[in-house]
Amino acid sequence: MDLTRYVNTFGNYLRQKYGEPIHKLSVNADFTCPNRDGTKGIGGCSFCNNNSFSPASTKAGSVTAQLHAARTRVEQVRKARRFIAYFQSYSNTYGEIERLKALYDEALAADEIIGLAIGTRPDCVPDPVLALLADYQQQGHEIWLELGLQSSFDTSLERINRGHTFADYEDAVQRAHHFGLNLCTHLIMGIPGETAKDTLTSYQRVLDLGVKAIKIHPLHIVKGTQLAREWKQGLVPDLTMDDYVNTVVEIIKTAPKELLFHRLTGSGAHQYLLAPDWVKHKWDILGAIYAGLVNH
């Protein structure tokens, strides 16, 4: 199975650009989010238990120590010698600019770290942060700003307690473009109340804004979340694998050649997962996506 026959994958992009495989190393810098700390709300997104989707990152130790530990784990199973530091947990631009710079500088100080991937919310990227990231990019580092949108529908964003709007996302994208930053947008399929058509609409709206890359995830119902409580009450229908695969295939078929796919699914930590069970089987999902592309 060679998905790169049909999909412009981020991994292949990095391999072609740098002449070798580049791997991401997750970092937890102990950030929070404005919809968790009371600024915009409490409790966070209704689907979010951060341990479930960034289990490899921990709060133990400095950025340097975390990167060293992650690199040691990766080098046991991968051939990668150079890496991108992935600030993944919560909103990694939500803080004082001095603290952000110190953390990012610490990550980039390691010779094997070629760049940063910064996961955050569209309402947490003021211009000084964008300027800082643009400065790193101009120095030759591989910089990616990953904006968690999840849906372009404000009713859905409210439903999952995101605490921001699609207009916030549009504003963030336009300002990031002004600074020349590489943008990746996260989308979730299976949000309660949404259909496959809604996911395709969100995808098209992201494309229309000139974003360079996307990540697509099926909705995970994980322990310790508001969504889990609703699911147990029968209020959240399970997303089927067929619906997910068919929608992803449709997205890939209609994608511009230059659009990068950073991820086509997400598996998370199995010990937290309640539903749907099929998301545990990453390679089955990717195989079904590949088969759908071949048969098309």
Q: Which positions does each model-derived feature cover?
A:
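Hydrophobic faces of well-ordered beta-strands that scaffold small-molecule active sites
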Residues: 23-27, 83-88, 116-118, 143-147, ...
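Auxiliary Fe-S-binding modules of radical SAM enzymes
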Residues: 2-12, 18-23, 213, 221-296
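N-terminal [4Fe-4S]-dependent radical SAM core
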Residues: 1-84
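Core AdoMet radical
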Residues: 51-70, 74-97, 112-125, 142-168, ...
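Acidic (Asp/Glu)-rich catalytic clusters
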Residues: 74-76, 103-111, 131-142, 174-178, ...
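Conserved C-terminal portion of the radical SAM core fold
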Residues: 167-226, 242-265
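Generic structural signal for well-ordered alpha-helices
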Residues: 64-71, 100-105, 130-134, 170-173, ...
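Short amphipathic alpha-helices and their capping/turn segments at secondary-structure boundaries
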Residues: 71-74, 125-142, 200-210, 253
